[in-house]
Regions:
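Transmembrane alpha-helix interface motif
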Residues: 1-42, 48-57, 143-153, 157-160, ...
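Membrane-helix interfacial "entry" motifs
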Residues: 14, 37, 60-65, 98, ...
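Alpha-helical transmembrane segments and their helix-start/interface "positive-inside/aromatic belt" motifs
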Residues: 25, 64-75, 250
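Transmembrane helix-loop junctions in multipass membrane proteins, especially transporters and channels
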Residues: 41, 45, 60-64, 88-97, ...
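Membrane-interface helix-boundary signature
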Residues: 44, 63, 70, 106-109, ...
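Alpha-helical transmembrane segments and their membrane-interface exit regions
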Residues: 51-61, 75-79
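Juxtamembrane/interface alpha-helical elements of multi-pass membrane proteins
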Residues: 70-188
Length: 269
């Protein structure tokens, strides 16, 4: 299960999506999320799903990597679907009414839409991290949040912290897997027993994991100090961010997506 968590990983490539400016990809992620929450019917959901599918195909990221990253979310998706099925009250007679629990057609439709929305939302986030290196992501975030410097917001530090946290997710997952394998070799059992027994079994994992995380953080801080890192003031960049033609074309496609979903919502198509 731990090995299926792929958030924060970067897959090097030379596709159009990889070569987009990181600011473009961040803005397009926001645009896509807005379009996703504006979608209210089958046609609009099909449109945003097709848009993401085409983007994944263009990026040359294997679809199995996206699907593998979804495995740890199965319980959340099932829980979300069940809640919407049983707690949505519709009009007319229920489809099923057993022991006081009624299931309406509206509940089934809402459950499908909510699960699909979560899947598309997570998949679009995966696509961003898969096609954007942590350094590029940091530069893009810092550039987009640059206006906040006028109100003394530590933009560079915030973007750096977010990207380091994202980058360390795969590292901590790998470390957790190693610790679990070592504990299993010593006879630890993480699968049987009650919930309390499973919770107690996690203690031998969490303690060395926290120690490892602090050690890695200290090593990272030492490495940054040795390279004379002193924050974002006066820093120059090896690769300057510049918008290119395909970035503006991508913005135009994003605007068309928002407009199309808005039209579908207004006219109920």
């Amino acid at each position: 299960m731990l090995k299926d968590i792929t958030l924060g990983q970067y897959f090097p490539g030379n596709s159009v999506v990889h070569r987009l400016d990181p600011r473009t990809k961040l803005v397009m992620l926001v645009v896509y999320i807005v379009a996703l929450f504006m979608a209210t019917n089958v046609v609009s959901y099909a449109l945003v799903a097709a848009f993401l599918f085409v983007a994944i195909k263009i990026s040359t990221i294997p679809m199995k990597s996206i699907v593998r990253g979804m495995k740890p979310l199965v319980l959340i998706l099932v829980f979300t679907g069940v809640l919407n099925i049983f707690f949505t009250v519709g009009e007319g007679d229920p489809l099923v009414d057993l022991w006081g629990v009624a299931i309406y057609k509206e509940g089934l439709i809402r459950a499908v839409f909510m699960v699909l929305r979560i899947l598309l939302l997570i998949s679009s986030t995966f696509l961003l991290t898969y096609t954007t290196s942590p350094i590029s992501l940091t530069d893009g975030l810092e550039s987009l949040m640059a206006p906040l410097k006028k109100i003394h917001v530590p933009v560079h530090e915030l973007s750096m912290m977010m990207c380091i946290a994202l980058r360390f997710i795969p590292t901590l997952i790998e470390e957790t897997d190693k610790i679990m394998c070592a504990q299993k070799a010593r006879g630890a059992d993480f699968e049987s027993g009650s919930i309390m027994d499973k919770a107690k079994a996690l203690v031998p994992i969490l303690v060395p994991l926290f120690i490892s995380a602090f050690r890695r953080a200290d090593e990272l801080a030492t490495a940054m100090e040795c390279r004379c890192y002193q924050g974002g003031d006066g820093r120059t960049k090896m690769k300057l961010l510049r918008y290119k033609l395909w970035d503006f074309e991508t913005f135009a496609i994003g605007a068309l997506l928002i407009a199309a979903v808005a039209v579908l919502k207004v006219y109920g198509l």
